[in-house]
Swiss-Prot record:
This is G patch domain-containing protein 11. The gene is gpatch11. The keyword Metal-binding does not apply. It comes from Xenopus tropicalis (Western clawed frog). Pfam families: DUF4187, G-patch. Transmembrane segments: none annotated. Keywords: Centromere, Chromosome, Coiled coil, Kinetochore. Its main location: nucleus. InterPro entries: DUF4187, G_patch_dom, GPATCH11. It is found in: Chromosome, Centromere, Kinetochore. Signal peptide: none annotated.
Amino acid sequence: MEEEEEDYMSDAFINSLQDVRPGMSMPRRVKECYEKEEKHKEANIKNRQQKLKDVEKEKRDTKLNEALGNENKGFALLQKMGYKKGQALGKKGDGIVEPIPLNIKTGRSGIGHEEMKKRKAEENLESYRRKIQMRKHDEEQAADDFRMRMKSKREEIRLKADLSKSQRACMLLDGQKSISTPREAWYWPKMNEQEADEEADEETEEDEDLVEEELSTLEKLQILTSYLRGRHLFCIWCGTTYQDDEDMESNCPGDTAEDHN
């Protein structure tokens, strides 16, 4: 029985064929093989190009390292002018001996681009250094300002403590001498509101407050300690009442806290 001929127009035959129409995606295995082959070709081309560059460089370096012979017209002319092989250039013989190396440009950038790029990098580095220095200076200045503020704050606390101590001593010593009213309202510690209403007139208080507000803590301390030393021969830092001026002059270091440190 004769085999039936295939019907090339049948759906079964057409569906069995691979669809290779333009624009249709290839099977995954075929695509991978194709990409692998392309990468292999590219690698071979790059290797050949690299080998060619290496060969050219080797030949160039070999030629450049060879000394010029007498057959070279330029070298022969130098010899006629008195130059000897291996001699340094210049009248004094202190010039270069080796030729200036040849710098082969392989990039696509224009002439002067590398120099400009190098200069730009140096400028950026210098700018970065300046910023670092400025930041360091600002940080040091901020630290100094903070230390000064803390020092001023501690100093103000100490001055207020010394003033309070002086006010209490003044009230006690004035009382021992039957002085019932302080020379200035702030010479003594502040009384509570009830005592103040009973002891002082409102207008007088307002005038004294104005004077008090004009004085700093340091100024008040200087005035009050001077009063205590002159009126009562008392030093708050020594904590001593002296017998007379001579006794105070001989035994008290001075009229400030620093003198007693």
